[in-house]
Amino acid sequence: MALSPLLGAYVIACFRDPVRYALPPYAVLIPFGSSFKVFPGAFGGISSLLGLLLGAALLIQLVTTRWGSARIPLAIPVWLAFLALSGFSLFWSIAPGATFLDLRILASNVVLLVALVLTRFDHRTLRLFATSLMAGGVAVVGYGLVQMTLLGGLPGKRTGPGDGPPRFGDDLLGANNEAAALLLPLAVAASRTLTESGRSRLLHGAATLLLLLGILMTGSRGGLLSAFVVFAVVLWLGIAPRARKAVIATSVVVLIALALMFQPFGFGRRQVENSTNSSGRTDIWMVGAQACPLYCLGGAGWGAFPTVYQQELSSTPEARVQPRGATFEPHSIFLLAVIEVGLPGLVIMVLGLAVALLSAWRLPAAMRAPPMAALLGTCVSSFFLSNINYKFFWAVIAYVAVSETVAAATQERAEPARPAVGGLVPAQQEVQ
Protein backbone atom coordinates (compact mmCIF):
# COMPACT_ATOMS: atom_id res chain seq x y z
CA MET A 1 0.00 0.00 0.00
CA ALA A 2 2.89 2.35 0.69
CA LEU A 3 3.93 2.08 -2.96
CA SER A 4 0.45 2.84 -4.30
CA PRO A 5 1.12 6.56 -4.92
CA LEU A 6 4.32 5.75 -6.81
CA LEU A 7 2.55 3.06 -8.81
CA GLY A 8 -0.28 5.45 -9.64
CA ALA A 9 2.18 8.13 -10.73
CA TYR A 10 3.97 5.61 -12.93
CA VAL A 11 0.72 4.52 -14.60
CA ILE A 12 -0.17 8.16 -15.30
CA ALA A 13 3.29 8.74 -16.78
CA CYS A 14 2.84 5.67 -18.99
CA PHE A 15 -0.42 6.99 -20.40
CA ARG A 16 1.16 10.39 -21.05
CA ASP A 17 4.24 8.99 -22.80
CA PRO A 18 4.05 5.20 -23.25
CA VAL A 19 7.11 4.96 -25.48
CA ARG A 20 9.29 6.60 -22.86
CA TYR A 21 7.93 5.06 -19.66
CA ALA A 22 6.11 1.80 -20.51
CA LEU A 23 8.06 0.41 -23.46
CA PRO A 24 11.58 0.23 -21.92
CA PRO A 25 10.67 -1.89 -18.85
CA TYR A 26 8.47 -4.10 -20.99
CA ALA A 27 11.34 -4.68 -23.43
CA VAL A 28 13.78 -5.37 -20.59
CA LEU A 29 11.53 -8.07 -19.11
CA ILE A 30 10.85 -9.93 -22.38
CA PRO A 31 13.62 -12.56 -21.92
CA PHE A 32 12.47 -13.23 -18.34
CA GLY A 33 9.12 -14.60 -19.55
CA SER A 34 6.56 -15.05 -16.77
CA SER A 35 9.13 -15.49 -14.01
CA PHE A 36 7.82 -12.62 -11.90
CA LYS A 37 4.21 -13.64 -11.34
CA VAL A 38 1.72 -11.29 -9.69
CA PHE A 39 -1.47 -13.16 -10.60
CA PRO A 40 -2.11 -16.69 -11.89
CA GLY A 41 -2.77 -17.20 -15.56
CA ALA A 42 -1.13 -16.40 -18.88
CA PHE A 43 -1.21 -12.63 -18.29
CA GLY A 44 -0.32 -12.62 -14.59
CA GLY A 45 3.40 -11.92 -14.91
CA ILE A 46 4.90 -8.45 -14.57
CA SER A 47 6.03 -8.59 -18.20
CA SER A 48 2.51 -9.36 -19.42
CA LEU A 49 0.96 -6.71 -17.16
CA LEU A 50 3.41 -4.14 -18.52
CA GLY A 51 2.50 -5.29 -22.03
CA LEU A 52 -1.19 -4.76 -21.31
CA LEU A 53 -0.45 -1.33 -19.84
CA LEU A 54 1.72 -0.43 -22.83
CA GLY A 55 -0.92 -1.61 -25.30
CA ALA A 56 -3.73 0.26 -23.55
CA ALA A 57 -1.68 3.47 -23.33
CA LEU A 58 -0.68 3.28 -27.00
CA LEU A 59 -4.24 2.61 -28.17
CA ILE A 60 -5.63 5.52 -26.13
CA GLN A 61 -2.89 7.75 -27.50
CA LEU A 62 -3.74 6.69 -31.05
CA VAL A 63 -7.46 7.36 -30.50
CA THR A 64 -6.97 10.77 -28.91
CA THR A 65 -4.12 12.10 -31.06
CA ARG A 66 -3.02 12.04 -34.67
CA TRP A 67 -1.26 8.89 -35.78
CA GLY A 68 2.47 9.29 -35.50
CA SER A 69 3.23 7.06 -38.49
CA ALA A 70 2.14 8.43 -41.84
CA ARG A 71 2.92 5.11 -43.49
CA ILE A 72 1.55 1.71 -42.50
CA PRO A 73 4.02 -1.08 -43.32
CA LEU A 74 2.68 -3.94 -45.40
CA ALA A 75 3.54 -6.32 -42.56
CA ILE A 76 0.62 -4.97 -40.52
CA PRO A 77 -2.28 -6.10 -42.78
CA VAL A 78 -0.48 -9.40 -43.38
CA TRP A 79 -0.21 -10.23 -39.68
CA LEU A 80 -3.75 -9.00 -39.06
CA ALA A 81 -4.90 -11.44 -41.74
CA PHE A 82 -2.98 -14.21 -39.97
CA LEU A 83 -4.68 -13.30 -36.69
CA ALA A 84 -8.09 -13.26 -38.38
CA LEU A 85 -7.56 -16.69 -39.91
CA SER A 86 -6.38 -18.07 -36.56
CA GLY A 87 -9.47 -16.62 -34.92
CA PHE A 88 -11.83 -18.11 -37.51
CA SER A 89 -10.20 -21.51 -36.94
CA LEU A 90 -12.05 -21.59 -33.62
CA PHE A 91 -15.17 -22.60 -35.61
CA TRP A 92 -13.60 -25.84 -36.90
CA SER A 93 -10.93 -26.50 -34.27
CA ILE A 94 -10.59 -30.05 -32.94
CA ALA A 95 -9.51 -28.52 -29.60
CA PRO A 96 -11.55 -25.31 -29.17
CA GLY A 97 -10.43 -24.80 -25.58
CA ALA A 98 -6.76 -24.81 -26.57
CA THR A 99 -7.54 -22.61 -29.57
CA PHE A 100 -9.21 -19.99 -27.40
CA LEU A 101 -6.35 -19.94 -24.88
CA ASP A 102 -3.61 -19.65 -27.51
CA LEU A 103 -5.63 -17.14 -29.53
CA ARG A 104 -5.62 -14.71 -26.59
CA ILE A 105 -1.83 -14.72 -26.56
CA LEU A 106 -1.52 -14.32 -30.33
CA ALA A 107 -4.06 -11.49 -30.37
CA SER A 108 -2.30 -9.58 -27.59
CA ASN A 109 1.02 -9.79 -29.47
CA VAL A 110 -0.42 -8.73 -32.82
CA VAL A 111 -2.45 -5.84 -31.36
CA LEU A 112 0.64 -4.56 -29.52
CA LEU A 113 2.61 -4.81 -32.78
CA VAL A 114 0.01 -2.71 -34.60
CA ALA A 115 -0.11 -0.12 -31.82
CA LEU A 116 3.69 0.22 -31.77
CA VAL A 117 3.94 0.63 -35.53
CA LEU A 118 1.24 3.33 -35.61
CA THR A 119 2.90 5.26 -32.78
CA ARG A 120 5.20 8.21 -33.32
CA PHE A 121 8.83 7.02 -33.21
CA ASP A 122 11.99 8.86 -34.18
CA HIS A 123 15.65 7.86 -34.19
CA ARG A 124 15.98 8.67 -30.49
CA THR A 125 13.02 6.56 -29.35
CA LEU A 126 13.97 3.77 -31.77
CA ARG A 127 17.42 3.67 -30.18
CA LEU A 128 15.78 3.64 -26.73
CA PHE A 129 13.70 0.64 -27.81
CA ALA A 130 16.77 -1.22 -29.08
CA THR A 131 18.82 -0.32 -26.00
CA SER A 132 16.06 -1.61 -23.72
CA LEU A 133 15.94 -4.91 -25.60
CA MET A 134 19.71 -5.23 -25.32
CA ALA A 135 19.63 -4.36 -21.62
CA GLY A 136 17.04 -7.08 -21.06
CA GLY A 137 19.30 -9.64 -22.70
CA VAL A 138 22.29 -8.57 -20.62
CA ALA A 139 20.19 -8.60 -17.44
CA VAL A 140 18.84 -12.11 -17.99
CA VAL A 141 22.33 -13.51 -18.66
CA GLY A 142 23.53 -11.80 -15.48
CA TYR A 143 20.61 -13.42 -13.67
CA GLY A 144 21.71 -16.81 -14.97
CA LEU A 145 25.28 -16.26 -13.80
CA VAL A 146 24.00 -15.31 -10.34
CA GLN A 147 21.97 -18.51 -10.27
CA MET A 148 25.05 -20.55 -11.12
CA THR A 149 27.51 -18.86 -8.76
CA LEU A 150 25.49 -17.63 -5.76
CA LEU A 151 22.17 -19.50 -5.70
CA GLY A 152 23.35 -23.09 -5.83
CA GLY A 153 23.08 -23.71 -9.55
CA LEU A 154 20.44 -23.55 -12.25
CA PRO A 155 16.99 -24.57 -10.94
CA GLY A 156 15.96 -26.77 -13.85
CA LYS A 157 12.95 -26.94 -16.09
CA ARG A 158 9.66 -25.30 -15.12
CA THR A 159 8.20 -24.34 -18.48
CA GLY A 160 7.07 -27.83 -19.45
CA PRO A 161 7.84 -31.54 -19.29
CA GLY A 162 11.47 -32.46 -19.69
CA ASP A 163 14.47 -34.33 -18.42
CA GLY A 164 18.24 -34.08 -18.42
CA PRO A 165 20.57 -31.72 -16.56
CA PRO A 166 19.35 -28.15 -15.96
CA ARG A 167 20.16 -25.54 -18.60
CA PHE A 168 20.11 -21.76 -18.44
CA GLY A 169 16.63 -20.55 -19.30
CA ASP A 170 14.83 -23.74 -18.30
CA ASP A 171 12.96 -21.83 -15.59
CA LEU A 172 12.33 -18.79 -17.81
CA LEU A 173 11.25 -19.30 -21.43
CA GLY A 174 12.78 -22.74 -21.78
CA ALA A 175 16.45 -23.05 -22.73
CA ASN A 176 15.99 -23.11 -26.51
CA ASN A 177 13.57 -20.18 -26.53
CA GLU A 178 15.85 -18.30 -24.16
CA ALA A 179 18.64 -18.57 -26.72
CA ALA A 180 16.28 -17.29 -29.42
CA ALA A 181 15.24 -14.38 -27.18
CA LEU A 182 18.89 -13.26 -27.01
CA LEU A 183 19.29 -12.94 -30.79
CA LEU A 184 17.80 -9.44 -31.15
CA PRO A 185 19.83 -8.06 -28.21
CA LEU A 186 22.90 -9.74 -29.73
CA ALA A 187 22.26 -8.11 -33.12
CA VAL A 188 21.95 -4.66 -31.53
CA ALA A 189 25.06 -5.07 -29.36
CA ALA A 190 27.21 -6.55 -32.14
CA SER A 191 26.19 -3.84 -34.61
CA ARG A 192 27.03 -1.06 -32.17
CA THR A 193 30.35 -2.72 -31.37
CA LEU A 194 31.13 -2.54 -35.07
CA THR A 195 29.94 0.99 -35.82
CA GLU A 196 30.46 3.05 -32.67
CA SER A 197 33.68 4.28 -31.12
CA GLY A 198 35.42 4.88 -27.81
CA ARG A 199 33.76 3.82 -24.59
CA SER A 200 30.50 2.94 -26.35
CA ARG A 201 32.29 0.36 -28.49
CA LEU A 202 33.90 -1.21 -25.43
CA LEU A 203 30.61 -1.38 -23.53
CA HIS A 204 28.73 -2.90 -26.44
CA GLY A 205 31.60 -5.30 -27.09
CA ALA A 206 31.34 -6.53 -23.50
CA ALA A 207 27.56 -6.85 -23.91
CA THR A 208 28.08 -8.86 -27.11
CA LEU A 209 30.40 -11.32 -25.35
CA LEU A 210 28.01 -11.65 -22.41
CA LEU A 211 25.04 -12.36 -24.70
CA LEU A 212 27.07 -14.92 -26.62
CA LEU A 213 27.98 -16.54 -23.31
CA GLY A 214 24.28 -16.66 -22.45
CA ILE A 215 23.51 -18.54 -25.67
CA LEU A 216 26.27 -21.04 -24.87
CA MET A 217 24.85 -21.43 -21.35
CA THR A 218 21.48 -22.50 -22.78
CA GLY A 219 23.08 -25.45 -24.57
CA SER A 220 20.89 -24.68 -27.58
CA ARG A 221 22.39 -25.86 -30.86
CA GLY A 222 19.82 -23.98 -32.93
CA GLY A 223 20.52 -20.89 -30.83
CA LEU A 224 24.25 -21.12 -31.51
CA LEU A 225 23.64 -21.61 -35.23
CA SER A 226 21.32 -18.59 -35.24
CA ALA A 227 23.95 -16.55 -33.38
CA PHE A 228 26.42 -17.32 -36.19
CA VAL A 229 23.82 -16.06 -38.66
CA VAL A 230 23.38 -12.86 -36.64
CA PHE A 231 27.13 -12.22 -36.58
CA ALA A 232 27.50 -12.98 -40.29
CA VAL A 233 24.75 -10.52 -41.27
CA VAL A 234 26.06 -7.79 -38.95
CA LEU A 235 29.55 -8.16 -40.44
CA TRP A 236 28.11 -8.19 -43.95
CA LEU A 237 25.83 -5.17 -43.65
CA GLY A 238 27.51 -3.14 -40.92
CA ILE A 239 29.21 0.11 -41.93
CA ALA A 240 32.79 -0.23 -40.69
CA PRO A 241 36.33 -0.65 -42.05
CA ARG A 242 37.14 -4.13 -43.31
CA ALA A 243 40.01 -4.46 -40.86
CA ARG A 244 37.67 -3.92 -37.91
CA LYS A 245 35.22 -6.47 -39.32
CA ALA A 246 38.04 -8.99 -39.73
CA VAL A 247 39.22 -8.48 -36.15
CA ILE A 248 35.73 -8.90 -34.70
CA ALA A 249 34.96 -11.94 -36.87
CA THR A 250 38.23 -13.62 -35.92
CA SER A 251 37.69 -12.88 -32.23
CA VAL A 252 34.18 -14.34 -32.23
CA VAL A 253 35.22 -17.51 -34.08
CA VAL A 254 38.22 -18.07 -31.81
CA LEU A 255 36.21 -17.51 -28.62
CA ILE A 256 33.42 -19.86 -29.68
CA ALA A 257 35.92 -22.50 -30.80
CA LEU A 258 37.75 -22.31 -27.46
CA ALA A 259 34.47 -22.54 -25.56
CA LEU A 260 33.39 -25.62 -27.52
CA MET A 261 36.79 -27.30 -27.11
CA PHE A 262 37.48 -26.63 -23.44
CA GLN A 263 33.85 -26.23 -22.23
CA PRO A 264 34.54 -24.06 -19.16
CA PHE A 265 31.90 -24.65 -16.44
CA GLY A 266 30.17 -26.96 -18.92
CA PHE A 267 29.40 -24.15 -21.39
CA GLY A 268 29.19 -25.59 -24.90
CA ARG A 269 29.12 -29.21 -23.75
CA ARG A 270 25.61 -29.93 -24.94
CA GLN A 271 26.24 -28.36 -28.35
CA VAL A 272 29.20 -30.73 -28.84
CA GLU A 273 27.92 -33.93 -27.24
CA ASN A 274 24.45 -33.81 -28.86
CA SER A 275 25.53 -32.43 -32.22
CA THR A 276 23.91 -35.31 -34.17
CA ASN A 277 20.88 -35.83 -31.90
CA SER A 278 17.62 -34.22 -32.98
CA SER A 279 16.25 -34.34 -29.39
CA GLY A 280 13.06 -35.93 -30.69
CA ARG A 281 12.28 -33.21 -33.24
CA THR A 282 12.43 -35.52 -36.24
CA ASP A 283 10.02 -37.92 -34.54
CA ILE A 284 7.61 -35.07 -33.83
CA TRP A 285 7.94 -33.85 -37.43
CA MET A 286 7.16 -37.38 -38.69
CA VAL A 287 3.94 -37.33 -36.69
CA GLY A 288 3.15 -33.93 -38.21
CA ALA A 289 3.78 -35.31 -41.69
CA GLN A 290 1.47 -38.24 -40.91
CA ALA A 291 -1.27 -35.76 -39.95
CA CYS A 292 -0.77 -33.55 -43.00
CA PRO A 293 -3.32 -35.26 -45.29
CA LEU A 294 -5.99 -34.59 -42.67
CA TYR A 295 -5.12 -31.05 -41.60
CA CYS A 296 -2.69 -29.34 -44.00
CA LEU A 297 -5.44 -27.93 -46.19
CA GLY A 298 -7.79 -26.32 -43.68
CA GLY A 299 -5.97 -26.71 -40.38
CA ALA A 300 -6.86 -28.38 -37.11
CA GLY A 301 -7.34 -25.08 -35.29
CA TRP A 302 -4.94 -22.65 -33.69
CA GLY A 303 -3.20 -24.25 -30.71
CA ALA A 304 -4.41 -27.74 -31.62
CA PHE A 305 -1.08 -29.38 -32.53
CA PRO A 306 -0.73 -31.22 -29.17
CA THR A 307 -4.12 -32.82 -29.78
CA VAL A 308 -3.12 -33.76 -33.32
CA TYR A 309 0.09 -35.28 -31.98
CA GLN A 310 -1.80 -37.40 -29.46
CA GLN A 311 -4.19 -38.62 -32.15
CA GLU A 312 -1.59 -39.47 -34.78
CA LEU A 313 1.29 -40.82 -32.67
CA SER A 314 -0.06 -44.37 -32.67
CA SER A 315 -0.43 -44.21 -36.47
CA THR A 316 3.24 -43.32 -36.96
CA PRO A 317 5.23 -46.45 -36.07
CA GLU A 318 8.54 -44.99 -37.28
CA ALA A 319 8.30 -42.19 -34.68
CA ARG A 320 9.69 -43.04 -31.27
CA VAL A 321 7.47 -42.53 -28.24
CA GLN A 322 9.20 -39.76 -26.32
CA PRO A 323 9.89 -40.29 -22.60
CA ARG A 324 8.41 -36.90 -21.77
CA GLY A 325 4.80 -37.74 -22.57
CA ALA A 326 2.57 -37.24 -25.57
CA THR A 327 1.85 -33.50 -25.46
CA PHE A 328 4.38 -31.76 -27.69
CA GLU A 329 4.88 -28.52 -29.51
CA PRO A 330 5.72 -28.90 -33.21
CA HIS A 331 9.22 -27.41 -32.77
CA SER A 332 8.87 -25.41 -35.99
CA ILE A 333 6.62 -22.46 -36.68
CA PHE A 334 6.21 -23.68 -40.25
CA LEU A 335 4.89 -27.07 -39.17
CA LEU A 336 2.79 -25.31 -36.54
CA ALA A 337 1.20 -23.04 -39.13
CA VAL A 338 0.40 -25.70 -41.72
CA ILE A 339 -1.10 -28.13 -39.17
CA GLU A 340 -3.03 -25.58 -37.11
CA VAL A 341 -4.25 -23.06 -39.73
CA GLY A 342 -3.61 -24.99 -42.92
CA LEU A 343 -1.91 -24.04 -46.15
CA PRO A 344 -3.49 -20.54 -46.19
CA GLY A 345 -2.04 -19.85 -42.74
CA LEU A 346 1.40 -21.08 -43.79
CA VAL A 347 1.32 -18.86 -46.89
CA ILE A 348 0.29 -15.80 -44.86
CA MET A 349 2.96 -16.43 -42.23
CA VAL A 350 5.71 -16.89 -44.82
CA LEU A 351 4.47 -13.75 -46.58
CA GLY A 352 4.67 -11.83 -43.29
CA LEU A 353 8.28 -12.93 -42.75
CA ALA A 354 9.17 -12.21 -46.39
CA VAL A 355 7.67 -8.72 -46.19
CA ALA A 356 9.64 -8.05 -43.01
CA LEU A 357 12.87 -9.24 -44.67
CA LEU A 358 12.21 -6.99 -47.66
CA SER A 359 11.47 -4.04 -45.36
CA ALA A 360 14.70 -4.62 -43.44
CA TRP A 361 16.68 -4.88 -46.68
CA ARG A 362 15.27 -1.55 -47.93
CA LEU A 363 16.29 0.35 -44.80
CA PRO A 364 19.08 2.92 -45.11
CA ALA A 365 22.53 1.36 -44.83
CA ALA A 366 23.12 2.89 -41.40
CA MET A 367 19.95 1.25 -40.01
CA ARG A 368 19.91 -2.05 -41.88
CA ALA A 369 22.24 -4.42 -40.02
CA PRO A 370 20.52 -4.97 -36.62
CA PRO A 371 16.96 -5.56 -37.93
CA MET A 372 18.14 -7.76 -40.79
CA ALA A 373 20.46 -9.80 -38.58
CA ALA A 374 17.86 -10.28 -35.85
CA LEU A 375 15.15 -11.26 -38.33
CA LEU A 376 17.28 -13.78 -40.23
CA GLY A 377 18.56 -15.26 -36.98
CA THR A 378 15.01 -15.56 -35.66
CA CYS A 379 13.86 -17.23 -38.89
CA VAL A 380 16.63 -19.82 -38.52
CA SER A 381 15.76 -20.49 -34.88
CA SER A 382 12.05 -20.65 -35.72
CA PHE A 383 12.72 -23.58 -38.03
CA PHE A 384 13.52 -25.58 -34.87
CA LEU A 385 11.14 -23.83 -32.43
CA SER A 386 7.41 -23.10 -32.32
CA ASN A 387 7.98 -19.64 -30.83
CA ILE A 388 5.35 -17.57 -32.62
CA ASN A 389 3.40 -17.01 -29.38
CA TYR A 390 6.43 -15.60 -27.56
CA LYS A 391 6.99 -11.88 -27.03
CA PHE A 392 10.55 -11.96 -28.35
CA PHE A 393 9.34 -13.15 -31.78
CA TRP A 394 7.00 -10.19 -32.08
CA ALA A 395 9.63 -7.81 -30.69
CA VAL A 396 11.74 -8.63 -33.75
CA ILE A 397 8.81 -8.03 -36.12
CA ALA A 398 8.01 -4.77 -34.32
CA TYR A 399 11.64 -3.60 -34.40
CA VAL A 400 11.79 -4.10 -38.17
CA ALA A 401 8.44 -2.38 -38.79
CA VAL A 402 9.19 0.57 -36.50
CA SER A 403 12.59 0.99 -38.17
CA GLU A 404 10.76 1.12 -41.50
CA THR A 405 8.40 3.89 -40.33
CA VAL A 406 11.27 5.91 -38.84
CA ALA A 407 13.26 5.63 -42.08
CA ALA A 408 10.21 6.64 -44.14
CA ALA A 409 9.53 9.68 -41.93
CA THR A 410 13.17 10.74 -42.16
CA GLN A 411 13.09 10.45 -45.94
CA GLU A 412 9.90 12.50 -46.18
CA ARG A 413 11.42 15.29 -44.10
CA ALA A 414 14.53 15.26 -46.27
CA GLU A 415 12.63 15.60 -49.56
CA PRO A 416 12.02 19.17 -50.79
CA ALA A 417 8.43 20.38 -50.65
CA ARG A 418 6.57 20.05 -53.92
CA PRO A 419 3.98 22.63 -55.06
CA ALA A 420 0.40 21.41 -54.87
CA VAL A 421 -1.45 20.65 -58.10
CA GLY A 422 -3.22 23.78 -59.27
CA GLY A 423 -0.97 26.00 -57.18
CA LEU A 424 1.97 26.38 -59.56
CA VAL A 425 4.39 29.15 -58.71
CA PRO A 426 4.65 31.64 -61.62
CA ALA A 427 8.08 32.27 -63.04
CA GLN A 428 9.64 35.60 -62.15
CA GLN A 429 9.67 38.17 -64.93
CA GLU A 430 13.06 39.17 -66.24
CA VAL A 431 14.11 42.62 -65.05
CA GLN A 432 14.73 44.99 -67.96
Language model: regions and residue ranges:
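Loop-to-helix entry and N-terminal half of a specific, functionally important transmembrane alpha helix
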Residues: 22-27, 328, 332, 359-384, ...
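Alpha-helical transmembrane segments of multi-pass inner-membrane proteins
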Residues: 5-11, 80-91, 107-112, 127-164, ...
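Membrane-interface micro-motifs in multi-pass membrane enzymes
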Residues: 1, 41-50, 101-105, 170-184, ...
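Membrane-interface helix caps and helix-loop-helix hairpins in membrane proteins
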Residues: 38-42, 91-100, 216-217, 383-388
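Juxtamembrane membrane-water interface segments that cap and precede transmembrane helices
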Residues: 32-38, 158-171, 320-335
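Hydrophobic alpha-helical transmembrane segments
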Residues: 342-354
